Amino acid sequence: MSKINKLEHIRNIGICAHIDAGKTTTTERILYYTGKSHKIGEVHEGGATMDWMEQEQERGITITSAATTCRWQDKIINIIDTPGHVDFTIEVERSLRVLDGAVAVFDGVAGVEPQSETVWRQADKYNVPRMCFVNKMDRMGADFYRCVEMLKDRLGAKPLVIQLPVGIEENFKGIIDLIKMKAVIWKDEALGAEYFEEDIPADMKDKAEEYRAKLLDMVVELDDHVMEKYLSGEEVTAEEIKRLIRKGTISAVFYPVLCGSAFKNKGVQPLLDAVVDFLPSPIDIGIVKGREVSTGEEKDFLISVTEPFAALAFKIMNDPFVGSLTFIRIYSGKITSGTTVINTVKNKREKIGRMLLMHANNREDVKEASAGDIVALAGLKDTTTGDTLSDIDQQVILERMEFPEPVIELAVEPKSTADQEKMGLALSRLAAEDPSFRVSTDYETGQTVIKGMGELHLEIIIDRMRREFKVEANIGAPQVAYRETITKVCEIDYTHKKQSGGAGQFARVKIIFEPLKEVKDLKDEDKNKIFVFESKIIGGAVPKEYIPGVEKGLNNIRETGVIAVYPMIDFKATLVDGAFHDVDSSVLAFEIAAKAAFREGMPKGNPKLLEPIMQVEVITPDEYMGDIIGDLNSRRGQIQSMDPRGNAQVVTANVPLAEMFGYVNTLRSLSQGRAQFSMIFSHYDQVPSQVADIIKAKK
């Protein structure tokens, strides 16, 4: 593919949704029709191009975000296919951070499902413009209009319907394009490559007119001139409608809704047209937030080829042929192989070696990349997810990503001494790839503990350790990742002194600890953090160079809380005063003082134990509803809602994760295998005192 330098010709998009809504199948069809793939891969056969890890092909689900580049009309589309399973939410999170637009795929039968809501909220957080593709219109029970209502009710979104389905279930044969007011019908035998326009079927004329009027009512509001034209009865042209749909989509006034059946090869080409027509180019996004290293000043940086180089690393991946690959999104400037850049987060220089354009796990070497591109760099030494790579002379740090706290953990130990060293290497490599996966050592037992977002997440980590690194390990039972916090403000004044012979140590710190939810003037960028540190030192009571030691000490010690040695979260520490000695003070002395101040001060803050609460959604036939609700209540669950969906009932409840182990078997026996459930992490909440006593006793 020849390089197009014009930023307006690039679309960086993600395809995301609930598990099984058909994201990967939709992406496969896109690759086929854009000429990237000469054979369509089917997910259920384990042949999908984008699902390239062995585990993905066996399980038929997408675990990591595969990135690929393709071409439609005169535009370059960089696509990231993201997982829909809740345990891999981090993959969605980091993809959305670097994308300019997204296609949210919905199952035409199930509509808006729990993970769809999670992904939608994540996209809201990063202000990603998006459009909706209601898939599986050929399936029994598919209902396009109900899906549109669910977009309003469950997501609070403003859908802009631009297509209607022609036929339903097995009779689904095409769409009505409400912009052109034409029907688009596919020929079955031609793998969807052949389709033709015809007049709207007579029995759908009224519905098409109704939805066309709704479409026009919404778009003309964005342009006074077009509105006047519309109100005076003049025809609004297709070009004007497209321009206003683009304007409204980019500013998130509404979300265009399309439909089709990716599996049956219907509706994919108009979806590609809509990606090009309505989703933003990097120029439409315009700026990226960050700060200048030299001044520390927060500012907006222009997305432009002519600005100094700045890129964000959003994924690390181990490739069996190339080694470690770092995926970057270039926001400004350009880079060539052989250039040296700086990782401004770690203050380490990195030399750019091989630069690759990725097509799932196939690769194409490129010598140059510029603003708007998503490329993979081979052989970077110190760069991890969320780091900024920058021009050495004009250094910037781009806004970082927030990573969720793990909710489940288990102990692993190597089966033999030969596996010991290999296991350490394997786990550190896997942790570098995935920021929601953590590795630590239990300081009491010396065991290695791995932590993640769910049982499937850790199961796949262990599986990869065995397959890719040939490490055999014994696995403990899953444990809940409890946390600790404080519930009231407390203050501690602590002096660390060691001045008896030899080099001395001296540091005094006065720190105020307070619960984050009680901090009145919390900055916006701190609202999603679990620990915030601030220095209010005036007049040099503690020299500037020692203050990072205080923050480092607190950050390290908070990993072992004061109730039952669980990590301490959701608090702010403010350094308000202190003292130093000209000879005996050092960064290390202040680090030690901060740790001791934490140990002494935190018990005064009325510390409490926290547990992860999951949002559980159960879909069940009517007759099992009573038993299922009773069982959820017995698990300390709080029922949030009960809604009919088709001929089933949907129960939503908040339930502690500790009570959900083995739930799949209970649900199976309560409903004779007819109910299904999904759960996603909701929040941390205080553990009831009688339960907390049991947890403390076990520690």
Curated annotation (Swiss-Prot):
HAMAP family given in the database record: EF_G_EF_2_B
Species of the source: Rickettsia parkeri
Subcellular compartments: Cytoplasm
Classification via PANTHER family: RIBOSOME-RELEASING FACTOR 2, MITOCHONDRIAL (PTHR43261:SF1), TRANSLATION ELONGATION FACTOR G-RELATED (PTHR43261)
Family: Belongs to the TRAFAC class translation factor GTPase superfamily. Classic translation factor GTPase family. EF-G/EF-2 subfamily.
NCBIfam families: EF-G (TIGR00484), PRK12740.1-5 (NF009381), small_GTP (TIGR00231)
This protein's UniProt keywords: Cytoplasm, Elongation factor, GTP-binding, Nucleotide-binding, Protein biosynthesis
Domain of life: Bacteria
InterPro entries in the cross-refs: EF-G-like_DII (IPR053905), EFG_II (IPR041095), EFG_III (IPR009022), EFG_III/V (IPR035647), EFG_IV (IPR047872), EFG_V (IPR035649), EFG_V-like (IPR000640), G_TR_CS (IPR031157)
Name this protein carries in UniProt: Elongation factor G
Function recorded in the entry: Catalyzes the GTP-dependent ribosomal translocation step during translation elongation. During this step, the ribosome changes from the pre-translocational (PRE) to the post-translocational (POST) state as the newly formed A-site-bound peptidyl-tRNA and P-site-bound deacylated tRNA move to the P and E sites, respectively. Catalyzes the coordinated movement of the two tRNA molecules, the mRNA and conformational changes in the ribosome.
GO terms classed as biological process: ribosome disassembly
Chief location: cytoplasm
Ranges where the tr-type G domain occurs: 8-283
One GO cellular component, as annotated: cytoplasm
GO molecular function: GTP binding; GTPase activity; translation elongation factor activity
